[in-house]
Amino acid sequence: IKIMVERDPIKTSFEKWANPGHFSRTLAKGDPETTTWIWNLHADAHDFDSHTEDLEEISRKIFSAHFGQLAIIFIWLSGMYFHGARFSNYEAWLADPTHIKPSAQVVWPIVGQEILNGDVGGGFRGIQITSGFFPIWRASGITSELQLYCTAIGGLIFAALMLFAGWFHYHKAAPKLSWFQVESMLNHHLAGLLGLGSLSWAGHQVHVSLPINQLLDAGVDPKEIPLPHEFILNRDLLIQLYPSFSKGLTPFFTLNWSEYSEILTFRGGLNPITGGLWLTDIVHHHLAIAVIFLIAGHMYKTNWGIGHSIQEILEAHKGPFTGEGHKGLYEILTTSWHAQLALNLAILGSLTIVVAHHMYSMPPYPYLAIDYGTQLSLFTHHMWIGGFVIIGAAAHAAIFLVRDYDSTTSYNNLFDRVLRHRDAIISHLNWTCIFLGFHSFGLYIHNDTMSALGRPQDMFSDTAIQLQPIFAQWLQNTHVTAPRFTAPAATASTSFTWGGNDLVTVGTKVALLPIPLGTADFLVHHIHAFTIHVTVLILLKGVLFARSSRLIPDKANLGFRFPCDGPGRGGTCQVSAWDHVFLGLFWMYNAISVVIFHFSWKMQSDVWGNISTQGVVTHITGGNFAQSSVTINGWLRDFLWAQASQVIQSYGSALSAYGLFFLGAHFVWAFSLMFLFSGRGYWQELIESIVWAHNKLKVAPAIQPRALSIVQGRAVGVAH
């Protein structure tokens, strides 16, 4: 095995930090002339490409920056656990999760609990939290605040290790360029992160989570439950709960795996006590994932010479109509970090959105399903993160095209062919957007008009002209009936949302029930299709035209972001790849807003609510989604106004502190937006007269103040 590192390449010194712009070529030439340097500093601090041309140096910076990122994540996690240990009512919640609300943020008594959620239960004074950490802690077997303390300290130790690793692999033993091999990276990430990660989590769940949750579900007092290490060290404790533990690993090696069926189950549905997935199902899932990925982590050929060669697979991939096929794609992935990143971000972003949809349909943690605020927060959080990450995929795809793309190695392959018929792709997408926009909006306009004219029988709704989502309903039905044929041992389908007549309630609250789909969902679904297609249109146009267009044939020379193609060429502003990312973000926001509105109203109308002793379910908004959401007016009146009025009227309720913060945040937002609306020229003129006054008094600064450039102004604008 070759030595793949370079020893002591860069000495550790803080002197560089005192030297302004040690990574900026413009600043290195001398002191900055104008205040624009501050903005450029923010824009370029992490743009390693602009600091150096050397791919090895860029790769090392990325590698060590990842350790820094991990350190920040560990510090953040540690903070969460510390808050749970020091400022939370976790132990009280654990003893009575249906009546006590989670809180991990104490407030000075002078503020008064009566303006902060009222009583969170158990006489605790604090703000109700909606991060979902309590259910995660219970699922992982944490029974006391002391354990949270220990985990928080562990997090800090890991953060320190990561910071050390980041420093060590840049200053002491920096990897050579030949060390960054795609096959090795794939193998290690598949086997290490996903394989061993899942295996260790499955192990933890079997030995710690399962027994502790079993006892908690049975109503045992958390203080009487043995500590995690006792379950690990003393097998007899486990055998009392799960007799098959007495057989050890014998059934595993003799392939008699059914012996383990009490810890590795395939039940489907939810645990009726906690409203979460069966923990034994989750263990089974992670064990299976671990096996798959440990095998997958040995698939690719490295210097050991066994396994698949990605290059060979790609180059063999040719169709009758696709020219050179995938030839040349391997070179793209091995020479451009941006290309790799774009691919990974697109996949990760899509997965994050899939997670958002699983958190409510298959709630993984105990008592998560009845904490509606947390459910709403988790859905919103994962949708937004997924949206941002997908936009990032388009951004890095465009940067790859501008900075890293080499057309000679990609002649007539699939990538080249996509670029060559980009006009057809974009014009088709454009037509799709127009079609979806007019038709989906048109259905609503029709309904509003008929409603206003008093002709409900002529509206598109479940009670008049039906537009049932028959394919979605067929899919739901398939999932309800499938387990009988595909998994005879399963007691329920994968999710109760598919249909059937299962209703899971915890305490007096609904955890989950079948979600019916009707005309209202069909209409809003097409709004989703419309907004997503527009986002894709903008992003894809930015990527496909990043290097050149009919308007600006030499776009690649202007770079990833530029305001206009110089003076004297009107109509060439805001055409850079960066500007497409900017516009894409706005449409991503449009798309996700509609998704969150749909989710929020649908769940409150058809799923969430209380159940009476007679078994009658009363939903939060009384099942009004199907009839109200088929008109724009219904959305405005019965969703936006009905929900916003609670915030506006909150000043006299137990939520008043939140209402005031909400108001204050909007003031800050509007105040700063005001400066963006008033135009750059106005500010530049104002600045210059102020500079003139300073000059008169001989107190003028050496660095000349300057208004934001177009790109900078739009960057601040998009943050708003």
Swiss-Prot record:
Species annotation:
Ephedra tweediana (Vining horsetail)
Keyword Cell membrane on entry: no
Amino acids binding chlorophyll a? 674, 682
Q: What does this protein do?
A: PsaA and PsaB bind P700, the primary electron donor of photosystem I (PSI), as well as the electron acceptors A0, A1 and FX. PSI is a plastocyanin-ferredoxin oxidoreductase, converting photonic excitation into a charge separation, which transfers an electron from the donor P700 chlorophyll pair to the spectroscopically characterized acceptors A0, A1, FX, FA and FB in turn. Oxidized P700 is reduced on the lumenal side of the thylakoid membrane by plastocyanin.
For this protein, what is the EC number?
1.97.1.12
Positions of phylloquinone binding:
683
UniProt membrane topology term: Multi-pass membrane protein
Q: Which SUPFAM superfamilies match?
A: Photosystem I subunits PsaA/PsaB (SSF81558)
Residues that hold [4Fe-4S] cluster according to the record: 564, 573
Q: Which reaction does it catalyse?
A: reduced [plastocyanin] + hnu + oxidized [2Fe-2S]-[ferredoxin] = oxidized [plastocyanin] + reduced [2Fe-2S]-[ferredoxin]
Output the GO biological process annotations, alphabetical, semicolon-separated.
Answer: photosynthesis
Q: Which family does it belong to?
A: Belongs to the PsaA/PsaB family.
Coiled coil in keyword set? no
Question: What GO MF terms are annotated?
Answer: 4 iron, 4 sulfur cluster binding; chlorophyll binding; metal ion binding; oxidoreductase activity
PROSITE patterns on file: PHOTOSYSTEM_I_PSAAB
Where, by residue number, does the polypeptide cross the bilayer?
Answer: 62-85, 148-171, 186-210, 282-300, 337-360, 376-402, 424-446, 522-540, 580-601, 655-677, 715-720
Q: What is the lineage of its organism?
A: Eukaryota, Viridiplantae, Streptophyta, Embryophyta, Tracheophyta
Q: Where does chlorophyll a' bind?
A: 666
Subcellular localization(s) per the UniProt record: Plastid, Chloroplast thylakoid membrane
| Alphabetical keyword list | 4Fe-4S, Chlorophyll, Chloroplast, Chromophore, Electron transport, Iron, Iron-sulfur, Magnesium, Membrane, Metal-binding, Oxidoreductase, Photosynthesis, Photosystem I, Plastid, Thylakoid, Transmembrane, Transmembrane helix, Transport
Q: What is its main location?
A: plastid
Q: Which of the seven top EC classes does this enzyme belong to?
A: oxidoreductase
Q: Please identify the protein, giving its name as recorded.
A: Photosystem I P700 chlorophyll a apoprotein A1
